[in-house]
UniProtKB/Swiss-Prot annotation:
Cofactor(s) this protein requires: [4Fe-4S] cluster
The EC number(s) this enzyme carries: 7.-.-.-
Source superkingdom: Bacteria
Database matches in PANTHER family: ION-TRANSLOCATING OXIDOREDUCTASE COMPLEX SUBUNIT B, OXIDOREDUCTASE
Cofactor note: Binds 3 [4Fe-4S] clusters.
Biological processes per GO annotation: electron transport chain
Cell compartments where the protein resides: Cell inner membrane
Major localisation: membrane
The protein, known as: Ion-translocating oxidoreductase complex subunit B
Gene: rnfB
Region (Hydrophobic), start-end ranges: 1-26
């Protein structure tokens, strides 16, 4: 057998042995995540907007698990804060001042001024902006969370945040907050 083939076989066996060793070590020393962090993250809206003061929903969920206030998520609103309060076993708190007084807004791109640089698309955490390079962009308002992250990267300043009027189609129905009386057959008579 030539020396090249022997070297290839030895390197293959060595790679196989190290791969098996790494696989075993990964299972043996696996770090389990905190389930509270995972549950808190699942409750957050996943907009990664940073309005809470953290770079994304996962870091904010970690901070909540370590005792941070649960009322810093404007896109999640009161419903998310109440679910977080229930999860953490704390009393619900009013949303922070800037979150509560803030009117829901969505991004609006003045398409005639858009140069198609795609910087807003890259900044949008929920993929609510459509467009391609050197073509105008537009916002899918149903997907826009109003996080405001697309405004700053725009080099021609053609993105505005406009307030959304509440209509029957976009109004937040709090169905779990409406009192419902269950009437049994016996109490009808």
């Amino acid at each position: 057998m030539s020396q090249v083939i022997i070297a290839i076989i030895l390197l293959g066996l060595l790679a196989l042995a190290f791969g098996a060793l790494l696989g075993y070590a990964a299972e043996k020393f696996k770090v389990e995540g905190d389930p509270i962090i995972d549950q808190a993250e699942a409750l957050l809206p996943q907009t990664q907007c940073g309005q809470c003061g953290y770079p994304g929903c996962r870091p904010y969920a970690e901070a909540i698990a370590n005792g941070e206030k649960i009322n810093k998520c404007p896109p999640g609103g009161t419903a998310t804060m109440e679910k977080l309060a229930e999860l953490m076993g704390v009393d619900p708190e009013p949303l922070t001042a800037n979150a509560e007084t803030q009117v829901k807004k969505v991004a609006f791109i003045r398409e005639a001024e858009c140069i198609g640089c795609t910087k807003c698309i890259q900044a949008c955490p929920v993929d609510a902006i459509l467009g391609t390079g050197k073509q105008m962009h537009t916002v899918i308002t149903d997907y826009c969370t109003g996080c405001d992250l697309c405004v700053e990267p725009c080099p021609v300043d053609c993105i505005d945040m406009i307030p959304v009027a509440e209509t029957l189609q976009n109004w937040s129905w709090q169905l779990n907050a409406i009192p419902v009386v269950n009437i049994s057959e016996e109490s009808k008579c």
